[in-house]
Amino acid sequence: MLNTPTSARASLVVWHITDSALPTGAFSHSAGLETAVQAGEVVDAGSFLTWLRGYLRQATYGEALAVVLAHRVGSVEKLASLDELCFSTQTASEQRAAMRAMGKRMAKVARIIEPDDRLVVEYDAGLRERRYKGNPGIAAGLVLRAAGVDEHTAAAAYLMQ
């Protein structure tokens, strides 16, 4: 990762948003590992490594991409399209429910951090009014952009949580 100057506030927002203790539910979400174990797909270190590689690939092109695209969103219309796109890529009902719940919680935190950013406020309000489905990567991307964090750092930090 490149060394880039950043404000102390931006660094604090990164640390806060990506803290595993942040009460969004991400810490307790197994990302499908429990199901893979129960189905006999993960039984040893080798099969776990295979599962983990698949998870990281999905996270890179799913959640990290959601962070970057949310970081770039400039309008409510594009935000709505991104939310719908992210929801449509989640095929398992458990994943949709988990993402919706975590997205709602992350958006609430984002609004506390950046109460004057129009897209942060819009996403939180839209989730409460059920106009959006919810995705924590979108909420994180919006708040990290608003805090002045570049998109590369935002995506990398999000994957570290």
Language-model features: where?
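Extended, highly charged
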Residues: 152
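Charged, compositionally biased N-terminal leader segments and the immediate start
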Residues: 1-12
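A short glycine/serine-rich beta->alpha loop
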Residues: 12-23, 50-57, 88-95, 123-130, ...
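Short amphipathic alpha-helical surface patches that mediate protein-protein
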Residues: 53, 84, 159-160
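C-terminal auxiliary extensions adjacent to catalytic cores
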Residues: 41, 45-46, 155-161
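Long, contiguous hydrophobic alpha-helical segments, chiefly transmembrane helices and signal peptides
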Residues: 18, 22-29, 33, 62, ...
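Glycine/small-residue-rich interface belts in oligomeric ring/scaffold proteins
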Residues: 10-76
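Internal, conserved structured core segments that host functional sites
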Residues: 73-148
